[in-house]
């Protein structure tokens, strides 16, 4: 089997629950285990769909971003809809503790890195940012309790605007672009009279290798894709004592970011047709040894992906939300989920990594069409990115091809993620600036509202 790289960004969650009472420790443990199962299940289902596609492509997803987006939806669900969402998340029926768990998880994820600026420098400090938001059409009345819970537990800003206007979608896209530092410029959601609400999560990660590669050592070498094509791509050269392991079907190597060893990225090179799953990941994590000198050749690459999650989440148990959902915790009326999708970006070079994701859930009113069929994508080269203080998978993916044009510039990473649009809202939804010509945000009744300025 040709080399296949899998991308699986992982944040380690050993710190989750450190400040919680004994009564909640079991909930924390149950949610952490559920998250790990959810992460690999959603990835493996994508992998299956991708392998069936006519033209296999790279798969890069963030289970962490999807977890938060679906978690916000779960908060507004009741009865059997709540249970079907919990099933997809590997949580018990009627479970209501997810918001509290995610609140603590967000605190742990956003805690400052232990960083000695005098010794290591401010510029090399890893950056992990996440943001949530809730957007509702201006004619619908959302329940205050739901808005307040999202604000407190998910740090989600709330804004009402006319979702049938292109200007409204532009405002939401600007929020996403800002939170992902320009790496995801648009959610590609069309304005619609039927669209009532959008739940959005944005995730951004940027870090430098603890021991980087020299551009002078990078050479053009062949990369063999899953479709048996051969592409000449820039191969970076690492020669260090690295964490290395050999497990069933894979050779694995782990590279650390920064000097505090909180974040890491693991690459899995297949040696046969063994499927990459949670068991393989866990075996490698337990088997790593740094006693070996490892000479690693790794391609420099950039890849972007957009995936519809509807079919995958239906297979995982969330079929009811796409037909006739009970979302009465969010608002009154006949509601259903029309779209759940994720966009992602990944760039890897001699200095380090930039990874970002945005997940969006679109909620509409009316009767859902009886049948919709969806198609996703595919296949070669495995990896993981970890925050080893929280134990959570942030990104899962599968690199099958390298865009030769996108990786010719050895300084491409420095040009990514440093531009951002003007901030629109802070984490609690307060207005930061106007939205540009013809648009502004006003406060009415304690809530933000988008208005056209003539």
What is each of the regions a protein language model found here?
Residues 406-408, 441-454:
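C-terminal tail/sorting-segment detector
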Residues 1-4, 454:
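Positively charged n-region of N-terminal signal peptides that target proteins for export
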Residues 56, 92-271, 287-369:
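Non-catalytic, conformational "gating/processing" segments within enzyme and secreted inhibitor domains
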Residues 16-85, 95, 178, 367-370, ...:
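Flexible propeptides and autoinhibitory/regulatory segments associated with cysteine proteases
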Residues 404-431:
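Residue-level detector of functionally pivotal "anchor" positions at catalytic/ligand-binding pockets or at interdomain
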Residues 202, 436-440:
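A glycine-anchored, Pro-Gly-centered beta-turn/N-cap motif
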Residues 199, 251-268, 369-403:
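Extended hydrophobic
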Residues 4-13:
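Sec-dependent N-terminal signal peptides
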């Amino acid at each position: 089997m040709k080399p296949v790289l899998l991308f699986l960004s992982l944040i380690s969650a050993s710190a989750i629950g450190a400040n919680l009472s004994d009564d909640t420790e079991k909930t924390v443990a149950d949610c952490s285990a559920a998250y790990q199962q959810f992460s690999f299940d959603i990835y493996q289902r994508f992998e299956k769909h991708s392998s069936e596609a006519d033209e296999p492509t790279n798969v890069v997803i963030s289970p962490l971003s999807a977890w938060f987006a679906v978690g916000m939806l779960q908060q507004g669900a009741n009865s059997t809809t709540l249970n079907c969402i919990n099933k997809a998340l590997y949580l018990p029926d009627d479970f209501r503790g997810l918001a509290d768990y995610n609140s603590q998880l967000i605190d742990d994820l956003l805690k400052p890195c232990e960083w000695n600026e005098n010794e290591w420098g401010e510029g090399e400090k890893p950056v992990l940012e996440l943001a949530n938001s809730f957007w509702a059409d201006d004619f619908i009345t959302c329940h205050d309790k739901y808005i307040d819970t999202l604000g407190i537990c998910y740090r989600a800003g709330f804004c009402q605007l006319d979702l049938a206007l292109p200007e409204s979608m532009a405002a939401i896209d600007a929020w996403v672009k800002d939170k992902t530092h320009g790496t995801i410029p648009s959610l590609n959601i069309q304005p619609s009279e039927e669209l009532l609400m959008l739940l959005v999560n944005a995730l951004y990660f940027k870090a430098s290798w603890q021991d980087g590669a020299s551009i002078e050592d990078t050479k053009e070498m062949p990369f063999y894709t899953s479709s048996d094509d051969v592409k000449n791509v820039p191969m970076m050269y690492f020669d260090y004592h690295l964490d290395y392991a050999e497990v069933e079907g894979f050779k694995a190597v782990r590279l650390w970011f920064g000097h505090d060893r909180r974040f890491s990225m693991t690459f899995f090179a297949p040696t046969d047709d063994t499927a990459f799953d949670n068991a393989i990941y866990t075996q490698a994590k337990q088997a790593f040894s740094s006693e070996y000198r490892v000479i690693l050749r790794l391609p420099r690459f950039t890849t972007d992906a957009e995936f519809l999650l509807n079919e995958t989440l239906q297979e995982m148990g969330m079929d009811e939300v796409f037909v006739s959902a009970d979302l009465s915790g969010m608002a009154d009326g006949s509601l259903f989920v029309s779209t759940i999708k994720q966009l992602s970006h990944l760039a890897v070079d001699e200095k380090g990594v930039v990874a970002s994701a945005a997940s969006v859930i679109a909620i509409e009113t009316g009767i859902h069409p009886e049948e919709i069929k969806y198609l996703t994508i595919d296949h070669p080269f495995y990896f993981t990115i970890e925050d080893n203080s929280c134990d959570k998978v942030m990104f899962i993916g599968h690199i099958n091809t390298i865009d030769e044009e996108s990786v010719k510039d050895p300084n491409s990473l420095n040009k990514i993620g440093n531009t951002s649009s003007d901030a629109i809202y802070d984490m609690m939804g307060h207005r930061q600036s106007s939205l540009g010509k013809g648009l502004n945000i006003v406060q009415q009744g304690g809530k933000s509202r988008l208005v056209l300025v003539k």
